[in-house]
């Protein structure tokens, strides 16, 4: 009898162990932080889950509609209340969305309107052999104007879009990007007609001739995904623009195989629009700062996908992605790049790499990042990709981290680095945890991320579900 009891106890303990291991394997890496102890496999310094700055929950938002097609989800508030707009689309080719549809909620997502199609993609926008893609790029409630302002992105292709984009990677540019803005005083129920953002002369968009050269060549820009209201009553909106550039002989040799993505003897720099509401004109008065840029040997594709935030004390922090594609990733490491303004954006410091508060640099792929200040903690956070080893061009696009920003040192607080998501068993090495929308839920004060995990399934990188991540700060 005693022997049988002993066997039962052993069996019971073994069963508990198996169950524990099973749930450990199921537990996502999300919500864990980078270890003060060193991993024998990667050399990465990580800390314990108990020291993570937030708890993370991931859930499937919209499954992939079929092989080779990704679900895309974007969520944003309209106005200062609880009105939400959700946009969904499909993507089967890089950077080309199709089948856009939209719905609205008046009560923070408890109930929703019916879905309505909206013409935004190249599958519906065509004029002879010219194609167009339009996309809501950035939106914010401006308390100084008491209006919701939205920036709309427009890309015009001189030819079939996927062929035009393929030619771009060879250094042939047959598309043009422009941005316009519109605003609403009734939480997005009605909008003004879009008005083009300009920083130089030239014609504005002609709906009867999308490829009008006077418009097509002038005021080209790739805008930010974020509009930032400032404490002085202005709004800030950074944008990528082309600037003249001359290589030195040494750099010419280093970059001999690098295409001129912005055009011969030009690089992509970043300037910042500042808008101040003018009640007499019922419009914004705009200024545009002198662009910052880096040599091609620092970033072969220039500075891209900028975002700006206001630090405590009023300084402005501009963060930008770079790329080391075509270069040795060890000699020319991929970084995140920053510039700081102490005079409200009139002038900007020289561009330097974003670092930890310890002074250490970190590797980063060519992906965008976002800043967000929590109303729960009043702290500023950065969300983006940091690589465990030297990044090569666009990848790897994992892990995805959140970290607190040291606003005095203008650096990431290394001890706060927390994994939101990472490469999981079953994911392919082409996994992308990089293209996302972000908001703070105005009821729960949790952060919400909407992200399509491109590369999560074998066979086709676009066979991707869209996910929602809930981040509850500790």
What kind of feature is each model-predicted range?
Residues 2-16:
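N-terminal Sec-pathway targeting helices
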Residues 9-10, 18-21, 34:
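Short hydrophobic transmembrane-like helices used for membrane targeting/insertion
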Residues 25-40:
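Signal peptide processing junction and immediate N-terminal pro/mature segment
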